Amino acid sequence: MAESPFFLRPELLPVIEATPEQTTWNLPAMRAGGDALLENPHEAINRLEVTARGRSFIPDGLRDNAPILVSIHGGGYVAGRAAFDDAKNDELATRFGAIVLSPEYRLAPEFPFPIPVDDCISALAEALERFGYERPIFVLGDSAGAGLAYSMVCRLYGLVSPVLQDEETMARYEQISSMIRGVVLLEPCIDPTLSTHSSSLFADGPIWTRRAAAGAWSHFFGLALATEEEGKKSAIPEALVESAFPKPREHLRAVGFPPALVVVNPVDPLRDEGIALATGLVDSGCIAELHMFAGTFHGSLSVPDSVTWDEIRSLISRFMTENY
């Protein structure tokens, strides 16, 4: 690996070597690489319940008012599985005394937007039927998972219209949204325009690249895959982007949009879109906080047994405690 001109935490450098190229233009190769890297069976400490919609870790001695933490996996919207995060989610269930739900959302391009967002909502609705509607909810996502977390919360709060606007659906969304206490967005992937400074500065990564992002966004929105040259800029209609990731508006506070914790990496093409989201929420009157740890890069925030992951868990723990 060539030496980076940017500071990277030494403890995280092995991640770059171990991570296969994110070939969103060649999904069979990308998915196979992810399977080889991440598909290591985890022996759960807590009780694990698996349904078609997701995987739930339930800690022993579960409190009646224990929260539900929805933990949405990343993968550029086109790869990954809920089981890949079993070790992390099992750990979070123990640490927070929470039911940790990882939705098994369907992947693009086979299932483009809004299907993955609706799958996450359906997984949460199913969990509430099983575990009760009296529990506070927190929503956590990493990278594309953070994008789905934000899009999911916006949909539940009525900031974008669901495909089916029947009264029963709207009433269910209103009930669920009233229970959400906070949303945690780690290195969020929410801006398909590829127009930020960091998108250009870190076009070659490490790990997540501008070309990978262009392919992922084409797949997510069900559009033709751009050529490498075309992928340098976005041709996704603005109205389509807004339907998935609406920019913060002044009325967000009025609808009770939940507090947000946003974490970005200094060396990441997605850095500036996360910063823009956090400041946009603040400018809209919402409660939001923004963190950036020196030397992190895309995909490095939850590396097991790292100081970085300890810092992130502490942030999440404090945020959940304050907003419970």
Label each residue range with its predicted role.
Residues R81-A82, K88, L101-P136, P304-D310:
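Catalytic nucleophile-loop/oxyanion-hole region of alpha/beta-hydrolase
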Residues H73-A79, V267:
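Active-site glycine-rich loops that stabilize anionic/oxyanionic intermediates
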Residues N65-G74:
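Short beta-strand element of the alpha/beta-hydrolase
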Residues M1-D60, A224-K233, P237-E238, Y324:
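A glycine/proline-hinged amphipathic helix-loop "lid/cap" segment
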Residues G141, G145, A149:
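Gly/Ala-rich beta-loop-alpha elbow adjacent to hydrolase catalytic centers
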Residues L8, N26, D35-L37, Y133-R135, ...:
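Alpha/beta hydrolase fold serine-hydrolase catalytic domain that processes acyl esters and thioesters
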Residues I68, G97-L101:
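A fold-wide structural signal in alpha/beta-hydrolase
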Residues R53-N65, P248-L252:
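Short beta-strand-to-loop junctions in surface cap/lid or active-site-entrance loops
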